[in-house]
Amino acid sequence: MRVVVISSFVSVSLQLSFLLLLASAIRSSSSPPNDPFLGISPQDEKYYKSSSEIKCKDGSKKFTKAQLNDDFCDCSDGTDEPGTSACPTGKFYCRNAGHSPVILFSSRVNDGICDCCDGSDEYDGHVSCQNTCWEAGKAARENLKKKIETYNQGLVIRRQEIEQAKVGLEKDAAELKKLKSEQKILKGLVDQLKDRKEQIEKVEEKERLQKEKEEKEKKEAELAAQQGKGDAEEKTDDSEKVEESSHDEGTPAVSQHDETTHHDEIGNYKDYPSDEEPAAEGEPTSILDEATHTNPADEHVVERKEESTSSEDSSSPTDESQNDGSAEKEESDEVKKVEDFVTEKKEELSKEELGRLVASRWTGEKSDKPTEADDIPKADDQENHEHTPITAHEADEDDGFVSDGDEDTSDDGKYSDHEPEDDSYEEEYRHDSSSSYKSDADDDVDFSETTSNPTWLEKIQKTVKNILLAVNLFQTTPVDKSEADRVRKEYDESSSKLNKIQSRISSLEKKLKQDFGPEKEFYSFHGRCFESKQGKYTYKVCAYKEATQEEGYSKTRLGEWDKFENSYQFMSYTNGEKCWNGPDRSLKVKLRCGLKNELMDVDEPSRCEYAAILSTPARCLEDKLKELQQKLEKLMNQDKPQNHDEL
């Protein structure tokens, strides 16, 4: 029994000894590095060397320099163990001289795998790592040299584009100023043409209404004349019966009536109501008969007047007798003109107007209501008209309107006493009517100094001025259709030109408000689109407008232009088409230095959120070029690293 206990005790002691030896071996394999600052980045060296007591970066506790890289984790964030694998959250910095530095998790230190090209992560000697940084860095240095060359060339292009942007902006500003000036002048001309067009349309409308009125009155007069003619025929039959009866009974006929009685009856016709017309025995019973049928008594009176006039002319050679004879002859002529006018206009005048007209020729009284007989021109009046200029006030009252009746009178030549107006009067009158429509724009333009090769605006000004002079709304003839059409055509063309100018002004104003960068380096982007074909899609990015994804004939809007972001490193497009059951589409375009504008690497890293890269000379910055040159210089000045055989 005692022997068994002793043997068990010996067995346990051997196991413990083995475990202690194993722990000692493990302890020696993870021994601290010879360099206490191994694994610390150059940026953090000052933090560790500033004092003898170091504070954990998370602020939890402090540790001494002796505790730094002692292979025991004192800080939960691994601040005290950057060069060992003691802390799971620690970071190890590979310097990789001659190549690019690398940061590793501390758990990969002394794990038997060479992670750093300089072999610094396997310092315990269990693995021999060759230093391959110089060879590996050779390709990186070549790429860096190419990148520097791209920046150099791109910087030259960028400077050129900046100069072109300055010129372009100045040109845009000058064009905007010129267009605004032209807009002001052209708007004045368009306003003048619009006023004249509206005036012409008013006159045309007035003429149209007057023509409709006259046609209506003419139809009413024709209807009344037809009705009156029927009444006259009935009354004529009655009158003939009365005359036959009077002849059979020996009663004197109408021809036996005294001239004075006939004068009194007709002269006092207007004293009777229209529905109580006097009807003398043996005379016509209507005024229409008086106007349309020749009265024997009237012929007798005219013949007697002519005979008395001729006898008085022969028997009285004195001046006074001659004057009396001339006056009677003129009176006879006037009577004849009235008779002729009545014959011509009998269908257009009402019964009442015919009655007044016939009565007035005997009594010498004028009707209270003016008739067309008042328009019969007199020789003396025509002579006075030829030598009496029309005043502006009279022209305004006339309003430039001429009825169709006046047109017929002048065209038919029935009253050819009118003579053509003096040409000098027409020119003087036309000049006066044009000056009333002169605007401020006319005062600003001197057409006498127009060059032999005038601009389009000067041509328009001259054309409008000629039109305004040619179209005279106060003339005594109806509106000339060809001139009216000319005004409308010029108004339409000038209005179209004005709209184009206003559209261009709006476009320029919007353009000049855009953000073209601190040095206007993105000015050349305005109005340009960049495309990239990737798979079945074609991506199109238009600066200051929109970005789209196209497939065949379908187009998806990825976003509208928003702004530049992160110091002009990105172009942002937002508020695109909504994704099904998702957000609105958007796009961010990363800008990088390149010798030409080229869109590439379009991707969708998140649902409906797109990303792309655009190379452009606009991003070849001088500060970035200096940074790259310094980096290359540092790499080239490094000595060729030695192999870590001693490790």
UniProtKB/Swiss-Prot annotation:
Q: Motif range for Prevents secretion from ER?
A: 644-647
**In which tissues or organs does this protein occur?**
Expressed in roots, rosette leaves, leaf blades, mature stems, cauline leaves, flower buds, flowers and siliques.
The segment annotated Disordered runs over 206-453
User: For the MRH domain, which residue ranges apply?
Assistant: 527-622
Q: Where in the cell is it found?
A: Endoplasmic reticulum
Compositional bias segments (type: Basic and acidic residues): 206-222, 230-268, 290-308, 326-355, 363-388
Q: What does this protein do?
A: Regulatory subunit of glucosidase II. Essential for stable accumulation of the receptor EFR that determines the specific perception of bacterial elongation factor Tu (EF-Tu), a potent elicitor of the defense response to pathogen-associated molecular patterns (PAMPs). Required for sustained activation of EFR-mediated signaling, but not receptor FLS2-mediated signaling elicited by the bacterial flagellin flg22.
Protein name in the entry: Glucosidase 2 subunit beta
* Annotated source species: Arabidopsis thaliana (Mouse-ear cress)
